[in-house]
Amino acid sequence: MPTFVDRVVLHAAAGDGGHGCCSIHREKFKPLGGPDGGNGGRGGNVLLRVDSGVTTLLDFHFHPHQRAGGGRPGQGSNRHGADGDDLVLSVPDGTVVLSPDGEQIVDLVGAGSTYVLAHGGRGGRGNASLASARRKAPGFAELGEPGEQLDAVLELKSVADVALVGFPSAGKSSLVSVLSAARPKIADYPFTTLVPNLGVVQAGDHRPFTVADVPGLIPGASQGRGLGLEFLRHIERCSLIVHVLDCATLEPGRDPLTDLDVIEAELAAYTTDLSDRPRLVVLNKVDVPDAAELAELVTPDLQARGLAVHQISTASRHGVRGLALALAELVASLRAAVPSPAATRIVLRPRAVDEPDFTVRAEGDGFVVGGTKPLRWVRQTDFSNEEAIGYLADRLARLGVEKELAKRGAFPGVAVTIGAVTFDWEPTLSGREALLAAGGGDGDGYGEAGYGAVDTAVTIATVGGSGGTRAGARGGAVVSDLPLGPRGTDLRLRTSKRLTRAQRTALSDSADDFDDGAGFSDSAAFGDSGGSGGDADGGRG
């Protein structure tokens, strides 16, 4: 079973928003209590937070699917649902969040650094929040918005000041054990170290620094031999690279200079350019017979390359203290050379006033509407409720979607897709006005001839049975077989004029004449009626 994992694929799902409640207040002696449905709660977020006590991504290796809590639904009596609980995932310092395509999203460095990986969905509004002067008792509520779901790749890049690189069994783990209190596994066979080991070194009065022991490299590591270059990501943040060279190796064809050239070639093959990092050479195992002579022999050549050289023995601890002090001074100078981070500058880019909140594009035989608002509205609409559908149509019309569709040549009945929902577009009253302005609708019952070139919207009434059909159009035009919009919409009644008592009486008399068989030639009545009697329910206004 693995004990160290530095790369995982995380499947994060934020909580869904709670549904709004559709409720009417019921109380003794209050016949018109009004709507009192509460709002749904917000869905929980999925957050990543750096925890200094976490050193591996092992938890996400066994539990890659993480889901936050959902919001609770609203209830009657104006009771709002509780928000969903946020899910906080603890990650090691130095965790990099990548998209599945490899694009870096965020780099989490420093204890307490937090990033919201997936946002919870909005809670749906209850009918109490949807009430208006025209819609005093909505018979619907909004659905909760689904939370975000995404896949992310988490990679751990150790945050260390010094990286120890070299061949297997060169003594890197032993050096970490004598420099710090770390106790990595040490044995006399290659590839004992399979995962990076970190140790904190305190040398003299200098600030502590961190040393990382990277698993051994061999020729061809860039092509995947040995452990490959898989763990070299852990030295990307290091400010100093230390080559640990074995002066006591008995393998043929190996010596400190050859080992140095091989390791440098493998580092050059790594994707990240490490050529700007300062180098330091440690000649290890000088306590072994003939190893000290070899160290003295190669030291001038190494110094000629501009490299600082230290001869040590981790077994006898010869030269270890001097090496620790030298490393501490180098790290301190490198830290001082790093410019202090500038304060984060927040740039505000306000959206232009005339910039639309949506997009409309033609696709195939229909149109596709995009934009944050239309997509969110569709997700929060209960399509089993006709009044909710009418409310959605009104919102889209007020946003300008219907006018834009008319400009692009849309006609009634064309397929319009918003998100995962496809509609057969039937314009509302304002949408028909836009069609008239655009000159569209010829031959389909919605053109100028059908409307009589009127400036206001048309409302109709249909009488079933033997009474036949009748239609009333403001402005004197007669239109038949035009579909009504959904009941309860604002735009159906937007152009209705408030009538005087005499006008309402005249309309009532006209309806009576029609019931007596006198016919109905020119009227502004509005309503639905059925049966052979043609009982009209008109005069709404």
UniProtKB/Swiss-Prot annotation:
Q: Which GO terms describe its molecular function?
A: GTP binding; GTPase activity; magnesium ion binding
Residues that bind Mg(2+): S173, T193
**At which positions is GTP bound?**
166-173, 191-195, 213-216, 284-287, 313-315
Q: Name one Pfam family in it.
A: DUF1967
Q: Which domain of life is it from?
A: Bacteria
Which prosthetic group or cofactor does it need?
Answer: Mg(2+)
Which Gene3D superfamilies did the record assign? GTP-binding protein OBG, C-terminal domain, GTP1/OBG domain, P-loop containing nucleotide triphosphate hydrolases
UniProt xrefs under SUPFAM superfamilies: Obg GTP-binding protein C-terminal domain (SSF102741), Obg GTP-binding protein N-terminal domain (SSF82051), P-loop containing nucleoside triphosphate hydrolases (SSF52540)
Main localisation: cytoplasm
Per UniProt, subunit arrangement is:
Monomer.
Q: What is the name listed in the Swiss-Prot or TrEMBL entry for this protein?
A: GTPase Obg
Which organism was this protein described from? Answer: Parafrankia sp. (strain EAN1pec)
Please name the taxonomic classification of the source: Bacteria, Bacillati, Actinomycetota, Actinomycetes, Frankiales
Q: Which gene encodes it?
A: obg
